[in-house]
């Protein structure tokens, strides 16, 4: 499994027993350090292969599965990262994703567009206005399973809480 945006390793305990290796792409040295205890407690080996999802040091069709959780919002070259992910996936490979992004509700989307610049400046480049299913389709992924909804919370949290989660095949 290649995990783009490995972060502090919070997904390690969620991998099924069939996973034999986790290849982590994580640009933050601090996040990588924070993942040390989770990595050391894992029965699955974890290796950090890169800092930039748009330039993966892996062979074509060398990975079975990908995972991206709450990372596509901050990747500067998100199209390049998804193209690279597709390149390294074996034919028929799939990715799991859970990402926040652009709401289909015009009123919420207007607020997302208004807040996007400030959001990026305050939160490490995080975008509110990325249409996740569209980004996946634009890079040749077929979205096979998709659930979209708002996270629980008060109405003012909606610009930050529209989530797309699912599975896509290469």
Where does each model-flagged region fall?
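Conserved beta-strand signature within the Rossmann-like core of class I S-adenosyl-L-methionine
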Residues: 92-100
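A short acidic, Gly/Pro-enriched loop at the edge of an enzyme's catalytic core
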Residues: 54-66
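A short glycine-rich, Lys/Arg-flanked "PGG" loop and its adjoining helix->strand segment in the class I
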Residues: 79-91
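Short "lid" loop at the C-terminus of a central beta-strand within the Rossmann-like core
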Residues: 29, 100-105, 149-151
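Core SAM-dependent methyltransferase catalytic element
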Residues: 147-170
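Short alpha-helix
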Residues: 124-140
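Class I SAM-dependent methyltransferase SAM/SAH-binding core
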Residues: 2-55
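A short SAM/SAH-binding and catalytic strip from SAM-dependent methyltransferases
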Residues: 64-77
């Amino acid at each position: 499994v290649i995990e783009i945006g490995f972060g502090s390793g919070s997904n390690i305990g969620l991998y099924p027993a069939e996973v034999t290796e986790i290849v982590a792409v994580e640009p933050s040295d601090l996040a990588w350090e924070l993942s040390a205890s989770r990595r050391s407690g894992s029965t699955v080996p974890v290796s950090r292969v890169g800092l930039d999802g748009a330039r993966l040091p892996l062979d074509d069709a060398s990975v079975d599965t990908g995972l991206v959780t709450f990372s596509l919002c901050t990747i500067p070259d998100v199209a390049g990262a998804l193209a690279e992910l597709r390149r390294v996936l074996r034919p028929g490979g799939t990715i799991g994703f859970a990402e926040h992004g652009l709401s289909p509700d015009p009123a919420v989307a207007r607020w997302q567009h208004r807040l996007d610049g400030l959001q990026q400046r305050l939160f490490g480049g995080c975008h509110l206005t990325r249409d996740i299913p569209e980004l996946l389709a634009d890079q040749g992924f077929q979205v096979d399973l998709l659930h979209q909804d708002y996270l629980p919370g008060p109405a003012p949290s909606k610009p930050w809480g529209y989530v797309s989660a699912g599975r896509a095949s290469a």
